[in-house]
Swiss-Prot record:
Gene3D superfamilies the UniProt entry points to: Hsp33 domain, HSP33 redox switch-like
Keyword Disulfide bond: yes
Subcellular location: Cytoplasm
Matches recorded under InterPro entries: Heat_shock_Hsp33, Heat_shock_Hsp33_C, Heat_shock_Hsp33_N
Transmembrane segments: none
Gene name tied to this protein: hslO
Similarity-based family: Belongs to the HSP33 family.
Protein name, UniProt field: 33 kDa chaperonin
Keywords: Chaperone, Cytoplasm, Disulfide bond, Redox-active center, Zinc
Length: 290
């Protein structure tokens, strides 16, 4: 569930989300290691936190590429409060870091954070910043400060063990009106700095309690929505992916007796029979003039 709204005469906007089930679904879909679960989980939470601020029918993609062993993590959200994502190396594992936590920064390494905003126009808007920590939350705050000139704070966490995802969530606070009194800015900064890790917070406190600790007072009107893991892949799209292959690759699949397309976003497998591949080959030949 995501909670979102504004504070201080609409000069500050916030969102806070708990989405254990969504991150657990991602873990199961992609058969992720513990560390990969935390990395993808953090990215999905980051993408979920911006959903209240997206334009109608907007698709927002967080794409992080780094020098670390996970190589790449991608999370996408929509204005319909859906998310999906994947990592390049779902089996990555590293020793715990010096704080005894999963080494997300080590898994990602040095690299870039790219945001793609697709509003359904001809060309999506793409912005890119260097990673400042590889922990994802700090990198998102840096992105918003530099690329969108919005002072922001993000806190994101995932707790996972042999039983699966235990806690997953985070919050985002953004100053959207620079006329906000300096004392309010300092209050928010101080309160956020004094908070424990978000995974510790969510073991004891509800989202509205966390917001009260951030702002120093009860929040007023809060809207809510359910965050869902949803992919828009289907068999027709998988078939079109096969048609992009050259004729020899399709013929090799046909000789093997089947072809398989796996969606990178949700790991759904689409299997095509020898007869279906024969039809695709015929279609490709008929429409290529060869």
């Amino acid at each position: 569930m995501i909670y979102y709204g504004t504070m201080f005469d609409h000069k500050v906007r916030f969102s806070i989300v708990r989405m254990r089930e969504v991150v657990e679904e991602a873990r199961n879909r992609h058969v992720l290691s513990y560390l990969a679960t935390v990395v993808l989980g953090r990215a999905l939470i980051g993408a979920a936190l911006v959903t209240p601020w997206l334009a109608e029918k907007e698709r927002w993609t967080l794409d992080i590429e780094g020098s670390g062993p996970i190589r790449r993590v991608v999370a996408q959200s929509t204005s319909e409060f859906t998310v999906r994502g994947y990592v390049a190396n779902p089996k990555v594992e590293l020793p715990l870091n010096e704080k005894g936590k999963f080494d997300v920064a080590g898994a990602i390494g040095q690299g870039v954070l790219r945001v793609v905003r697709d509003l359904g126009l001809k060309t999506p808007f793409v912005s890119q910043v260097p990673l400042v920590s590889g922990e994802i939350a700090e990198d998102l705050a840096y992105y918003f400060a530099v690329s969108e000139q919005i002072p922001s704070a993000f806190s994101i966490g995932v707790l996972v063990d042999s039983g699966g995802v235990k806690i997953a969530g985070g919050f985002a606070v953004q100053i959207i009106d620079r006329t906000l009194e300096q004392e309010k800015v300092e209050l928010i900064e101080r309160n956020i700095k004094n908070l424990p890790y978000i995974t510790e917070l969510f073991q004891k406190a509800e989202p509205l309690d966390v917001l009260e600790r951030i702002f120093g007072e009860k929040v007023g009107f809060v809207e809510t929505a359910e965050i869902r893991y949803k992919c828009d892949c289907n068999r027709e799209k998988a078939k079109n992916a096969l048609l992009v292959l050259d004729k020899k690759e399709l013929e090799d699949m046909r000789k093997e007796g089947k072809g398989e397309v796996v969606c990178k976003w949700c790991n759904t497998k689409y299997v095509f029979s020898e007869e279906e591949l024969e039809e695709l080959l015929k279609f490709k030949v008929d429409n290529s003039g060869s």
